């Protein structure tokens, strides 16, 4: 029985490695750049005139042939501005019809693309610019003053003017070709920033080979029905439309739409601006969106809107699947979604900036979301039995209580060419199915490392002696920092996080960064920040504050306001509790697990007053 369990999970007891159920596909010897790989996809039979991207707010569309031509024209203009191989281009822009073309143009020259969140404060943006050292910045007119104020020496290229200039060119699209940039698959392509527990974002360097691997992986997973199953009979790549409400300046959105849908040949419907259920569902209906990629707060809002006004019954939807990532999706939200949208499959995927996108995904064919059937890890290390909870009631009763697992909801199966280990954080033991440990992954999409940070790279990427990847992904394993287990079917579950990051509205918030800000307040003696559960946001940052002597007047709203003016909106402190001291180890490290006890003590104290 145990052997059968291991085989079904893709687990090899001899090596301790879990392997994807997909056949290996990555061509390690292919000496291509990402543009050399992706741009020919746009001229495949039947794709030239098909919309690659549609702006749902205006109806404007860009065909695959048009996307290719625009990318190459913009590349020519940027080359004239001095951008070339190895130089960094910062892209500061919200989602738009032209975001992918701007990105592909930069990559076509062998330059490195570093996208930035427009919501960053000037100080936060300055830190990224100082670290990335961009040669030039592609920026919208609205955001240009912010960037000019913090990086006066960086050459600014206004997106609106650039697009107007290349639109005036009259040469034949068919004669356009890639610039001779001499780019290799091991050259740096992307420099996206990932939050860290040190409080400073780290620049994640992904190569052209990483990007190719992710595009090929998504093409296979989505083109095959979602995760290893055969294509549904009615499935047609040419008829697929993906709803784009995710920011493309984050890796989930970038990999999904600049890599995935472009490789698949599917149309991406961009819904610009702040997320709105009304705008999104209108676009889903009007443009026949079949798959929608979201983060959990969007699911919560969709359910609330549907329950409030009968949204699904009034709309004729082709929507088949909603895929959520960025933070755990709670079981209760999945159940409510299913009752509101019974014809739509809701599942999760999992990925990191360090993996250049998605590494696990729920299978559309096999209903991998785990809401109907979930295997919990045994309460002990005894592996002589299989614990299967077949109903929601049983699952709730047997929940492990982990804060990150969404109540036993699967994050899917390993993507093509991805391998994994489950490692005991204390002993380093490699664990079999249904044992909980830290998830390590490797594959051809795993990052090269962190920019100018050898120490962080060495901690994150672990070389395993004598271990060679079967997928051409190298020998280094990425430590994800997440506690997970794999069940007997090969489904992966997140139980908790080893890392201390707060996931607020699917954004990563580093407690140490907020603690540094709080430490500058003249009336605060000591402070710590930890997550506080929130129904809509998942988690919100909450501060534990020790007042300085003589500062009894300090109030919660003053602390919140002080931090709010110094960080991006999603990072701001939402709650404050005043305590006598912050629990720390002898070395001064905050004992974060004990902060919950401080909160309970504070609540109990107030209830007795």
From Swiss-Prot:
The cofactors it requires, by name, are: Mg(2+)
Which Enzyme Commission number(s) are listed?
A: 6.2.1.12
- Which residues, if any, are the signal sequence? none
Sorted alphabetically, which keywords does the UniProt record give? Answer: ATP-binding, Ligase, Magnesium, Nucleotide-binding
Q: GO molecular function terms here? A: 4-coumarate-CoA ligase activity; ATP binding; CoA-ligase activity; trans-cinnamate-CoA ligase activity
The answer on whether this UniProt entry bears the keyword ATP-binding reads: yes
Q: Which reaction does it catalyse?
A: (E)-4-coumarate + ATP + CoA = (E)-4-coumaroyl-CoA + AMP + diphosphate; (E)-4-coumarate + ATP + H(+) = (E)-4-coumaroyl-AMP + diphosphate; (E)-4-coumaroyl-AMP + CoA = (E)-4-coumaroyl-CoA + AMP + H(+)
List of residues binding ATP: 194-198, 202, 348, 353, 482, 497, 589
Q: Name one GO biological process term.
A: phenylpropanoid metabolic process
Annotated region described as SBD1, given as residue ranges: 276-348
Amino-acid positions noted as binding CoA in the UniProt annotation, renumbered to this chain: 274, 506
For this record, the Gene Ontology CC terms, alphabetical, are:
peroxisome
Q: Using the UniProt annotation, give all residue ranges assigned to the region (SBD2).
A: 349-450
Q: Detail which positions bind (E)-4-coumaroyl-AMP.
A: 252, 256, 326, 348, 353, 361, 499, 503
Q: Name one Pfam family in it.
A: AMP-binding
InterPro entries, alphabetically?
A: AMP-bd_C, AMP-bd_C_sf, AMP-binding_CS, AMP-dep_synth/lig_dom, ANL_N_sf
Q: What does this protein do?
A: Carboxylate--CoA ligase that may use 4-coumarate as substrate. Follows a two-step reaction mechanism, wherein the carboxylate substrate first undergoes adenylation by ATP, followed by a thioesterification in the presence of CoA to yield the final CoA thioester.
PANTHER family, alphabetized: 4-COUMARATE--COA LIGASE-LIKE 8-RELATED, LONG-CHAIN-FATTY-ACID--COA LIGASE
Annotated family = Belongs to the ATP-dependent AMP-binding enzyme family.
Its domain description in UniProt is: Both substrate-binding domains (SBD1 and SBD2) are involved in the substrate recognition, and are sufficient to confer the substrate specificity.
List the protein's name: Putative 4-coumarate--CoA ligase-like 8
